[in-house]
Amino acid sequence: MSSLYYANALFSKYPASSSVFATGAFPEQTSCAFASNPQRQGYGAGSGASFAASMQGLYPGGGGMAGQSAAGVYAAGYGLEPSSFNMHCAPFEQNLSGVCPGDSAKAAGAKEQRDSDLAAESNFRIYPWMRSSGTDRKRGRQTYTRYQTLELEKEFHYNRYLTRRRRIEIAHALCLTERQIKIWFQNRRMKWKKENKTAGPGTTAQDRAEAEEEEEE
């Protein structure tokens, strides 16, 4: 009896609390009815209307805001239009449409092929026995500059045959090798002999003696 008395006294102390919520705001439903209510199963037009009615019952002065949509509420609060919510998606979609997936795949394949070729070249080693050292190997023709040709012509004018010491000096002065100097003088002597075929046999013997002396040195 004492507990029931205190409970009745407690509930009777707040008689106006039931008038805070409207009668139709939160209708009492059984557990089965709550599960089978189609308005509770989704966010349809009926659920929005009941929610707006309940909001009007709770906040009489805020009925205008309860009837607005979520985009309208955010637009009114931040000064944005509803169409601005999807603006960030447009450039991204345009970029995706402009990129061809086949190009990226081809670029990736070409890069992998190039990397594999470079790795193979770096691992490949050429040994001396792999290089051709026979007479069939062609040598590139040496080209002389105008200054080098002029100096060689001057030297040939005074000496058609060079000693080894003089050949080394000319090679260092003209930035050439001894072999290049020797080949140039041989070719120049052949040209000079063709130009002077009418020379006597004494001159030929003298040239042969000078050539033998050059080979010995």
Curated annotation (Swiss-Prot):
Record note on quaternary structure: Forms a DNA-binding heterodimer with transcription factor PBX1.
InterPro entries for this protein: Antp_homeobox (IPR050296), HD (IPR001356), HD_metazoa (IPR020479), Homeobox_antennapedia (IPR017995), Homeobox_Antennapedia_CS (IPR001827), Homeobox_CS (IPR017970), Homeodomain-like_sf (IPR009057)
DNA-binding residue intervals: 137-196
GO annotation, biological process: anterior/posterior pattern specification; embryonic skeletal system morphogenesis; myeloid cell differentiation; positive regulation of branching involved in ureteric bud morphogenesis; regulation of transcription by RNA polymerase II
Organism: Gorilla gorilla gorilla
Protein name: Homeobox protein Hox-B7
Family to which the UniProt record says this protein belongs: Belongs to the Antp homeobox family.
Primary gene name: HOXB7
Gene Ontology MF terms in the entry: DNA-binding transcription activator activity, RNA polymerase II-specific; DNA-binding transcription factor activity, RNA polymerase II-specific; RNA polymerase II cis-regulatory region sequence-specific DNA binding
UniProt cross-references to PROSITE patterns, sorted A to Z: ANTENNAPEDIA, HOMEOBOX_1, HOMEOBOX_2
Motif (Antp-type hexapeptide): 126-131
Disulphide bridges, residue numbers: none
Record keywords: Developmental protein, DNA-binding, Homeobox, Nucleus, Transcription, Transcription regulation
Subcellular compartments: Nucleus
